């Protein structure tokens, strides 16, 4: 075997293996969605980014979850260009790319059409902070970005969806590092986090909070918003400088 052949084989192996960690990570994260009851059929997708490599891995479009493997995950750059993969990436890839490119502190994104969160999105309503489960995770209502106008819809739709989210956060004075979830009016939820696993966690939390808020309004349609002192207490005991929740 010639040295040239060995060098070529080593190069190919390195090219294949350098993305393996995010392909494995995003495969495992995607497989959590049906287990958690957050997706039906091929709805939904998870991506995981590697900032040093300047790419993210994402679920291929329209492939059933029981047919997914780490090797089928598609590698994409932050401009939405496919770098490596035999399958087409998720139809929502450009939305993920826009968020990664503009929000540098996130490394995982989830998009689902989970039932209760999507119902709030279709109703074009923020999810009010009614209870401490909500306050354990964020101090504001879950925001709902307004529906997109016709110009955005008929343009580069998925790309513009990303900017609809970013613009709403800027206009509302929200910090994406604190509020790691959003509803897109008439559409569905997106969540994110420092890892793909955290983004999946946030997606599950959002669905639970959405269901609780819906049921709260059925029981008492004049239910008051959680008072600020309880919001502060519950959020800071988990996330504040003197947090004492958990074992660390």
Regions found by a protein language model. Name each.
Residues 1-15:
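N-terminal amphipathic/basic-hydrophobic helices that include classical n-h-c signal peptides
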Residues 16-248:
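Glycine-rich flexible loops
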